[in-house]
């Protein structure tokens, strides 16, 4: 991920700490009346189809992509010191820091998706990802 002030830069790009809506995370536009006060999707009988539309991050199999090993990264994601041609540093995080609104799910032997724990407002999910910024450490 790109670096800013010694930590991963936050944003909506494959090179940033975050997700690209509709690419990395499934989203839907739903009336705000379908969300509770904490911006989580209400159970269907409690949803009110009223209010402005808001983007929600759908809890499914998608999320922010993370590799479990340097070796499994494509060359364009690895900096030269790791045998690649990528321009951004590599970062790591203790999986114990992925808590609250986030869940780290290993979906292959070499890959993890950091997903929303439940369906929630996209803004809430993106804020939860951004709040992990201080826990990421550069890999040298």
Feature-to-residue mapping (PLM):
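NAD-dependent ADP-ribosyltransferases
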Residues: 1-140
């Amino acid at each position: 991920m790109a670096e800013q002030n010694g930590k991963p830069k936050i944003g909506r790009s494959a090179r940033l700490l975050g997700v690209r809506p509709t690419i990395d995370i499934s989203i839907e536009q739903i009336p705000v009346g379908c969300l509770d006060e904490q911006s989580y999707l209400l159970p269907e009988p409690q949803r009110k189809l009223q209010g402005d539309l808001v983007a929600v991050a759908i809890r499914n199999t998608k999320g922010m992509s993370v590799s479990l090993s340097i070796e499994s990264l494509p060359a364009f994601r690895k900096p030269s010191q790791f045998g690649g041609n990528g321009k951004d540093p590599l970062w790591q995080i203790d999986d114990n820091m992925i808590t609250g609104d986030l869940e780290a799910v290993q979906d292959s032997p070499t890959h993890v998706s950091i997903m929303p724990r439940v369906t929630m407002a996209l803004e809430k999910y993106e804020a939860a990802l951004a709040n992990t910024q201080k826990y990421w450490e550069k890999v040298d």
